[in-house]
Structures are given as C-alpha cells and as structure tokens.
Regions:
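Bacterial N-terminal signal peptides that target proteins for export
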Residues: 3-12
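Bacterial N-terminal signal peptides
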Residues: 12-21
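Acidic/polar low-complexity flexible segments
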Residues: 27-58, 136, 142-191, 237-282
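Sequence context of c-type cytochrome heme-c attachment sites
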Residues: 28-68, 82-107
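The canonical Cys-X-X-Cys-His
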Residues: 68-78, 162
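Beta-strand-rich interaction surfaces with strong enrichment in secreted/lumenal proteins
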Residues: 106-109, 216-222
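Short, well-ordered beta-strand segments enriched in hydrophobic/aromatic residues
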Residues: 116-123, 227-233
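Short helix-loop boundary/capping segments
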Residues: 177-220
Length: 282
C-alpha cells in the first residue's frame, strides 16, 4: 500500500510539473534575432505637460493636434526629433536644471502569441542627471498603453496623463501623481534595484503602482553599457489581436525620479495590424 501511495504521489507531482512546464512553454520568449526593430528617441520633456501642448501661445503645434495630427507625425524626422533642444533645456521649460543628455535612442521589439505580448527594449542610459535622488534604482523603465477611451490617445501618447498640477511640476502638489481626465492606461515598469518587483499598474484618476491584471513579468539587466529590458504580459485589456494600441516609453536614467525622465512621444503597437511598432506573431 505504501508503494501505491508513493506511485500516486509521484504521478501527481509529475502531472503538476507537466502543467507548470506547459505554462512556461506558453510564455516562451520569442527569438528576438528574428523580430523587427524600431528605434525611437526618448527625450527630457521639461515642463511641457498636456496643458502646455494645447496652449497656442506656447506651442504652435496645437493647431495640428486639433486637426487630428499626432505629435510624432510632426516631430519625428528620419528617426530623429526636430525639437529645439536648447529651448527644452532652458530655464523657460526646465526651471530646475536639465540633464546633460537631452535625448537618446531606445530600440523596441514586440512579439505576441495567443496568451501573451512580449516587448524588448534596448538602450544605453546616459549619466549626467540633474537630480539623481533615487538611490536604489540607477535606471527605471516604464511603458504605458492607452485604452480606447483616452481622448486623443493615439495622437499624444502618454501626454494625456501628464499635467501641470502633478508632483515635481513647478508649484504643484507633491502628493498628486499622473492622472487621466477620462479613459485609462495600463502601466508596467522595471526597476534596476536587486530584487525589485515588476510594476503591474494603471493610470486612471491617479497613478496606481499595483492592482493591474496583465500579469506583468520583467527581466532586465546591463551588459557592457547596454541595458536590455524584456516585458512579458497578458494579451488582454487594451492589447488585443486586430488592434493598434497607443503607447509610450519612459526611462529614468542615472537615479532620476519624478518628471526628470526621458520619454518617448506617442507611438502605436500593432497586433496583427499595421502600426509604428508591428508585433511579430509567434
């Protein structure tokens, strides 16, 4: 009888291992050497929240946004940004002090299967932050995906969450975080501190650093001077086959925090449809 129990137990264990194995197989990362790359520039945006973007006296591009143009449609030229970086770094738009490097490239790759979306980001994080106060994390990398209810989400990317009255903005409330007036973003973040957990959150009427339902997993690290960060999350919520989802990337480099990040403009990620970043079906 004892032998019988042992056999039953080992079969049960074997079954559990098989089930676990198949879960892992479902989340098998793609062969990144076969996945197309799209490089975007991330930049220090200073004090240019959505209110600034939509104020004609500050930003002549407001007219284009109102006509339905995207920020990137106007500002990305031959893979670079046509901004006046001197103005962005000036006291007018960065009253505290700008980082030494105003922009740098991030290469994005995306793939998906029935269950999951996989996103890989590679970049060299610059030193020279103005205010390196995050002692635990040399680098943090976040991505946000907008749902269909975010006004102008496919034009402005993450700017719909970026407001002049949020923390680290001049004269703003230190407790007030990113928020949207309507709609929601799914948020995921990698932190470089040893043992830091993946952030699976959202931005609604405030920023929530947990409570997301995307089952976000992330692996990140540095080889030489290049960071590679790979997110795995459920193909769910705003992400679905047949959809092009607005997204943005933010990198806090050199222990930066708050608004002292380098951000991308809004791009789209397409799952089975055309987009700025086309996700490769596995």
């Amino acid at each position: 009888e004892c032998e019988m129990k042992k056999t039953t137990f080992s079969l049960a264990l074997f079954g559990a291992l098989l089930a676990f194995g198949s879960q892992l197989a479902q989340a098998a990362a793609p062969d990144w050497s076969k996945v197309p790359k799209r490089t975007v520039q991330v930049f220090h945006a200073g004090v240019t929240p959505v209110e600034w973007v939509m104020k004609k006296s500050e930003h002549s591009g407001r007219t284009g946004v109102n006509k339905g143009e995207s920020c990137v449609g106007c500002h990305e030229e031959k893979g670079n940004l046509n901004f006046d970086m001197k103005r962005l770094a000036s006291k007018e738009l960065e009253p505290k002090g700008a980082p030494k490097t105003m922009s740098f490239p991030v290469t994005i790759q995306s793939a998906y299967d029935k269950e999951n979306a996989y996103v890989r980001l590679t970049f060299k994080a610059p030193a020279g932050a103005f205010d390196p106060v995050d002692k635990e994390n040399e680098v943090k990398v976040a991505m946000m995906f907008a749902n269909a209810d975010v006004p102008k989400g496919d034009q402005v990317g993450c700017w719909a969450t970026c407001h002049g009255d949020a923390r680290t903005m001049p004269g703003a409330d230190d407790k007030k975080t990113k928020y949207t007036k309507s709609g929601a973003y799914e948020l995921m973040q990698w932190k470089s501190a040893a043992g830091a957990k993946a952030v699976d959150g959202s931005v609604t009427d405030k920023r929530n650093m947990e409570g997301g339902t995307a089952n976000v997993q992330v692996e990140g690290g540095k080889s030489g001077d290049t960071y590679t960060v790979t997110f795995t999350r459920k193909l769910s919520g705003a992400l679905a086959e047949g959809k092009a989802v607005p997204f943005g990337v933010a990198v806090h480099a050199d222990h930066a925090t708050g608004r002292f990040h380098h951000v991308s403009m809004g791009y789209t990620m397409g799952f089975g449809v055309d987009a700025d970043v086309k996700s490769a079906k596995q």
